[in-house]
Design a protein with these regions (language model features):
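N-terminal targeting leaders of membrane proteins
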Residues: 137-156
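Sec-dependent signal peptide recognition
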Residues: 2-8
C-alpha cells in the first residue's frame, strides 16, 4: 500500500516511517497488546498477562485450543487478531472498532480498546454487553451494518496530498527542547476515490528538531518540528514530511 501525504494547516508532507516501529520481540508485542486493549502495560507474569488478554478478547482461555502452543504462537495470534491482521477480508479488531466509531460519530477515539467497545455498546444497545471483545464487536457490526459487508481496499495515496492538522499540545520555544515529541490530530477526512484513508481524528507524531529561545527587546523565539508519521484507519503507518 503506497501512501504519501502533504499536511497543511501546519502544512506537512507525509511520506511516513512507522509511527511506532512494528514490535519485534515477544515482550514488545505483549506490551503493545496491553496498551491497545487496556491503555497501559499490565502487571503479572507473562503467562498471566497472555491468559488475561485471551479472555478479554475471546471470552475465555481455551486450554485445549492453546495446548501445545508456545508463547510466541499465542502472542502472534492475538497480535494479528487485535492489531495487525494480514487478511483484508477480516481486519483487526482495532481497525473494525475504528470503522464503527467513524461510521457512528465521524471521528475515531484514542482510548483503550476495551473502553471504546464499552462506549459503542452503550451507544448502540443502551448498555455494555458481556463476552469477549471479538464477539461484542461482531454483534455491533451486525446491529450497525446489517447485511452490508465492508472490506479493506488497497489504494495509492497521491504524492503531495494536502490536509489540515491540529497540535494536541501547546509547544513553545520557552519551554520545549530539541527531541521533545509532538503529537497531532488530523482535522479532516482524507479520501482517495471515495475510500477513506485518514479519518478525522487520526493521530500522528513528530519531534522538535530546533529551538531558538526568545530574544531581547521583545523578539519572539522559534522552533522547528519534524512531523514524521500518521496512522491510517487500518493502523498502517504513513510517513510525513514538513
Amino acid at each position: 500500500m503506497k501512501k504519501t501525504v502533504l499536511a497543511a494547516g501546519i502544512a506537512l508532507v507525509l511520506s511516513f516511517p512507522s509511527m511506532a516501529a512494528e514490535p519485534s520481540t515477544l515482550t514488545d508485542r505483549a506490551d503493545r497488546l496491553d496498551e491497545v486493549v487496556y491503555g497501559s502495560i499490565q502487571n503479572g507474569s507473562f503467562l498471566e498477562r497472555i491468559d488475561s488478554l485471551d479472555t478479554e478478547i475471546n471470552g475465555s482461555t481455551d486450554e485445549k485450543a492453546t495446548e501445545g502452543q508456545g508463547l510466541d504462537t499465542r502472542i502472534d495470534r492475538l497480535y494479528n487478531e487485535v492489531i495487525r491482521s494480514d487478511n483484508d477480508s477480516q481486519p483487526s479488531l482495532d481497525t473494525r472498532v475504528n470503522t464503527l466509531e467513524y461510521y457512528l460519530t465521524d471521528k475515531i477515539k484514542q482510548d483503550p480498546l476495551s473502553s471504546r467497545v464499552d462506549t459503542l455498546d452503550s451507544t448502540v444497545f443502551g448498555k455494555e454487553q458481556t463476552g469477549g471483545l471479538a464477539s461484542r464487536v461482531t454483534a455491533l457490526e451486525k446491529a450497525v451494518y446489517g447485511d452490508n459487508h465492508y472490506e479493506l481496499t488497497t489504494v495509492t495515496l497521491p504524492e503531495n496530498t494536502v490536509f489540515k492538522i491540529s497540535l494536541n499540545d501547546e509547544v513553545s520555544s520557552k519551554t520545549n527542547q530539541v527531541g521533545d515529541p509532538v503529537h497531532f490530530t488530523v482535522a479532516e477526512d482524507v479520501t482517495v476515490d471515495n475510500v477513506l484513508v485518514l479519518p478525522r481524528g487520526a493521530q500522528g507524531s513528530g519531534v522538535i528538531t530546533k529551538v531558538n529561545g526568545p530574544k531581547f527587546f521583545g523578539r519572539s523565539g522559534s522552533l522547528e518540528i519534524s512531523f514524521d508519521q500518521v496512522i491510517s484507519i487500518d493502523e498502517d503507518t504513513i510517513p510525513t514530511v514538513l
